[in-house]
Amino acid sequence: MAYYKKPFTPKKPVRTFRDLEVYQKTMECAVLISKDIAPALVKQKYPYAERFAECALSVPLLIAEAHSLRFADFALGVGFLEKAMSASNKMIVYLEHARGLCGSKLDQSLIEDIVGRYAVCRVKMFHLEKSWKRFRSEYDDDKEKKGTGGFRY
């Protein structure tokens, strides 16, 4: 029987969206893409280079918006988190497409690393969504109609 060997350390409380691990990790990916991959794609005349860079930055942007909106309109906040998960999937598709088209002209290990990071972040965003929903039901926010302000964006 295997036991978890690392000592337990509680996570730092989340005060802003910048404290969310999924925000931090997807921002790291966006920086790596803008710095290392996007210029190489422009050189190779990759047809979707601009969309590629925009999509990379959209993931942390959507996470930040979701974190803020969940207090005003919970359903809208969760919807933005769903969009962030979708954008993570899109980034994996863009990265694999670029790797297929450009091949050895791109850093294959970097692309594989970023694909793995996006896949892990996608799962963590799903767990974050479940956590938000659990928190909402534990504190009876759904029964008291908190977060249903009909927020329009």
Feature annotation, model-predicted:
Residues 1-153:
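Amphipathic alpha-helical assembly/interaction segments
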